[in-house]
């Protein structure tokens, strides 16, 4: 069996206080804003949106912070455009116009796919939660959400990622600013191509 030789910990042996750098505890509500602040500082992008970060509890990937930026953010940071950097990426926007493609969520999704592949995990072995936080107070745009509420629409990047890993729960949250109208969705959970919460 694949688990042969592995030590199995009893529940009382597990240190529930210890968390790895990338693991998100349910009560840790500041991880997203904190990671966005660090990313803004690292990339030298103090105000422009959209940036996105994600963390997971999947064994072997829990120490990774997945990072992404919109085309405007990547340009301001002096980073290559996604179409230049990763033209053959696994997850691509279903948007038909340039402004509806290469969003921060797609950037994060592709970093996650690359990490899964590097870890040698099959799509079915990807079990757990991916917490994604994005900086735009308007919420995740309709193009990135495409197909989640209507299977007749083309699949956006969130649905593509979710269907690729059917055992992965994707919990998305967004920066919220009083007075800013939400035009997409701010906080939601997706699994296997559908909203679950």
Describe these PLM feature segments.
Residues 39-43, 54, 112-116, 158-165:
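Hydrophobic, Leu/Ile/Phe/Ala-enriched alpha-helical segments that form helix-helix packing faces
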Residues 1-63, 181-197:
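Low-complexity, glycine/serine/proline-rich disordered segments
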Residues 85-139:
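Short HxH-centered metal-ligating active-site micro-motif
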Residues 51, 129, 169:
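Exposed beta-strand and adjacent loop surfaces of beta-rich binding modules
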Residues 25-28, 110, 160:
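Generic detector of well-ordered secondary structure
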Residues 123-125, 133-197:
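Active-site or metal-binding loop neighborhoods of secreted/extracellular toxin and effector enzymes
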Residues 40-98:
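RNase H-like nuclease fold core
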């Amino acid at each position: 069996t694949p688990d042969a030789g592995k030590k199995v910990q009893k529940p009382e042996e597990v240190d529930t206080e210890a968390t790895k750098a990338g693991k998100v505890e349910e009560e840790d509500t500041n991880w997203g804003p904190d990671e966005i602040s660090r990313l803004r500082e690292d990339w030298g992008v103090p105000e422009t949106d959209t940036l996105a970060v994600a963390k997971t509890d999947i064994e072997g990937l829990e120490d990774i912070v997945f990072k992404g930026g919109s085309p405007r953010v990547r340009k301001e940071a002096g980073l290559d455009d996604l179409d230049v950097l990763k033209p053959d990426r696994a997850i691509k926007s279903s948007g038909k116009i340039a402004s509806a493609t290469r969003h921060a969520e797609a950037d994060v999704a592709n970093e996650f796919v690359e990490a899964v592949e590097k870890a040698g995990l099959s799509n079915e072995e990807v079990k757990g939660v991916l917490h994604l936080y994005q900086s735009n107070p308007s919420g995740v745009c309709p193009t990135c959400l495409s197909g989640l509420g209507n299977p007749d629409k083309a699949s956006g990047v969130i649905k593509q990622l979710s269907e690729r890993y059917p055992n992965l729960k994707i919990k998305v949250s967004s920066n919220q600013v009083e007075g800013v109208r939400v035009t997409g969705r701010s906080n939601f959970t997706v699994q296997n191509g559908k909203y679950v919460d």
